[in-house]
């Protein structure tokens, strides 16, 4: 009886799938035409502001029952596949594969890209600066561990610009080759992951040795080769390295997130929900920082982040990294930045880009 009820529903799904197949290929054909026009004008293949607008429209017009984030993931992969018909972009990231950095690449670009895993954040910057990759994805801050200082230092020095950002929830899982903790003698992970799971590990596996390694991807590789080792990593690593998850979501902070920035030579246009990152320094005098930031309040520009870093001059000078709402070309933001520049001892716009939800 149940088969009699399921048969017409399955036939309906098959018919809808056939329509989807036709529509997806029609979309791809139009995307190819877009690619031809871009090639004539030497326009960039990847336009983060355009893709951000598409994803925002998907969420706004979604009638359900599918969740908007799930639909956005589907549309991101559709755009990625269509973009690859124009040109498959190369994206450098902090490797190896199976890390949260690779997951951030997929969240920004989809999976239809050429990946370039790098051994360090410095190498990611060098790869993009040399033209080996069009874009790079690097971590800039974690909600529990704080700022990635090396990324800030390199953003100050580079000629590249920030063209996007990714806010990635960090969900750590404990995984092994066998799917069991039987016979496990050590738990491997990046030092930050071990710190972020410390309370959980103390409660559940207080006597097992913990070993810090270069990355969670490296930990997963170790667990693949050594049956006596477990790894802490993301779900992607388990899939990449053929491991089984023993315990999921073991991080102490359920709201743990890492923010990544996309670096490249592309300067995105405004999409309507933008953020601008700047770095500046001030003369060493009383009230200098307060006076410097006054133009933001004057022009009604909201500051969302303020971070200081030593300037390494030996004179107790500091660089201030500031994120503000809006695009650098927005009239009010443009006026505020112009005033900031006249007052600052050093001033640099790191980039304007679509703000990640």
Place the predicted regions along the sequence by residue:
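Domain-level signature for soluble enzymes in the chorismate/prephenate branch of the shikimate pathway
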Residues: 1-357
């Amino acid at each position: 009886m149940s088969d009699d009820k399921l048969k017409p529903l399955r036939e309906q799904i098959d018919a809808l799938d056939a329509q989807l197949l036709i529509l997806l290929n029609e979309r791809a054909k139009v995307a190819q035409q877009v690619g031809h026009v871009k090639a004539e004008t030497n326009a960039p293949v990847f336009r983060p502001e355009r893709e951000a607008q598409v994803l925002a429209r998907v969420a706004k017009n979604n009638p359900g029952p599918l969740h908007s984030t799930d639909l956005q993931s589907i549309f991101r992969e559709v755009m990625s596949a269509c973009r690859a018909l124009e040109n498959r972009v190369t994206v450098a990231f902090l490797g190896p594969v199976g890390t949260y950095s690779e997951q951030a690449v997929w969240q920004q670009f989809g999976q239809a890209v050429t990946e370039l895993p790098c051994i360090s954040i410095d190498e990611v910057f060098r790869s993009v600066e040399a033209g080996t990759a069009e874009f790079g994805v690097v971590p800039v801050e974690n909600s529990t561990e704080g700022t990635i200082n090396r990324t800030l230092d390199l953003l100050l020095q580079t000629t590249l610009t920030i063209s996007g950002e990714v806010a990635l929830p960090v969900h750590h899982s404990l995984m092994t080759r066998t799917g069991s903790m039987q016979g496990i003698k050590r738990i491997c992970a990046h030092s930050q992951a071990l710190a972020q799971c410390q309370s959980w590990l103390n409660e559940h596996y207080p006597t097992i040795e913990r070993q810090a390694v270069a990355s969670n991807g490296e930990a997963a590789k170790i667990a693949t080769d050594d049956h006596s080792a477990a790894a802490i990593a993301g779900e992607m690593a388990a899939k990449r390295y053929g491991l089984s998850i023993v315990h999921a979501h073991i991080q102490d902070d359920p709201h743990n997130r890492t923010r990544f920035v996309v670096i490249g030579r592309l300067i995105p246009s405004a999409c309507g929900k933008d953020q601008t990152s700047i770095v500046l320094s001030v003369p060493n005098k009383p009230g200098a920082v307060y006076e410097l930031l006054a133009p933001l309040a004057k022009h009604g520009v909201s500051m969302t982040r303020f971070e200081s870093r030593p300037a390494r001059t030996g004179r107790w000078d500091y660089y201030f990294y500031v994120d503000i709402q809006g695009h650098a070309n927005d009239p009010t933001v443009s006026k505020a930045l112009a005033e900031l520049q006249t007052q600052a001892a050093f001033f640099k716009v790191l980039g304007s880009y679509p703000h990640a939800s």
